[in-house]
Amino acid sequence: MIVEVFFRNYYRNYAKFDVDAVEKREFAFQPFGGGMVRHKAFKSVEELRRFAVEKTPRHMYHSSAYYERPDEGDMERKGWLGADLIFDIDGDHLDTEACRESKLVSIACLNDAREEANKLLDVLTRELGLKPRRIVFSGNRGFHVHVADEEVLALGARERRELVNYLKAAGFDPTRFAAKLGRRKVLLYEEEVEGNLLRIRQGVEDPRALKVEIDEVVTQDIHRLIRLPGSLNGKTGLAALPLTQQDLEKDAGEIVEKAVAFRKGNLKVRFTKDLRGPVLFDRIDAGEGDVKVLPAYLAIYLELQDFGKIYD
């Protein structure tokens, strides 16, 4: 498979994995042939990179949790030590015109997701006093935010669910909210919090301002697998790209451009189904059976999305 060759070359020459405490994480991989390989452990990022070159998986994941025995197959015997707090904002979950129009990666939909991610960061930092450890473009239609503050690591599923409810304004009482963060208890009163909870004031006129559209299942799962920052997204061929908060202020087109892994050359694609609409930086107008010569990154994206086949 031509795409697999491109992935292997990327992992051999360009990949920079961004993950803390490698030796305490479970890693999981989805091969190009399908299935899932779980409960892998590595002593270093370099050992992980060698594995990626040798096996060339389509998808690479690491656990949000830290374990005493990350390679143990029995979850009860892994020895859970705590878990990062993970937030996933995905265009698939955004009810905006741009995201409804296309299920492929479009810059317009990503800008909507980027705005939602900025709203999340504002709530985390200004309302809850949490500092994101890592912000990552998923390589597809959204963003991941990792929080590793000491006070959140020991939070169980129930406490994380309370936080989800707060972020999504589910059953929200605008006069008072209590959130337990480890030993710290934050009481949020509209009249007492610095900034007077901007979301509450805006929410009187626009209820959408109260709600942050996160994937609630991801955040409350204390054993969650999340895409490995620096790896390639097997649905798109784009890199899962670590970002700064300043990067997140830029247009999504600039973010995607930095995530392009295959910048050189063109490939010939035969379309296996009709495709008409925006895809990445381009607009595609092709019918089933059409043949087009496209930039390598776009050809790989279309094959991974099952819209065409690359051939010599």
Curated annotation (Swiss-Prot):
Residue positions of the active site: 88, 90, 215
TM annotation in the entry: none
InterPro entries given in the database record: DNA_primase_S (IPR002755), DNA_primase_ssu_euk/arc (IPR014052), DNA_primase_ssu_PriS (IPR023639)
Keywords: DNA replication, DNA-directed RNA polymerase, Magnesium, Manganese, Metal-binding, Nucleotidyltransferase, Primosome, Transcription, Transferase
Family: Belongs to the eukaryotic-type primase small subunit family.
NCBIfam families in UniProt: primase_sml
Entry protein name: DNA primase small subunit PriS
Species this chain originates from: Pyrobaculum neutrophilum (strain DSM 2338 / JCM 9278 / NBRC 100436 / V24Sta) (Thermoproteus neutrophilus)
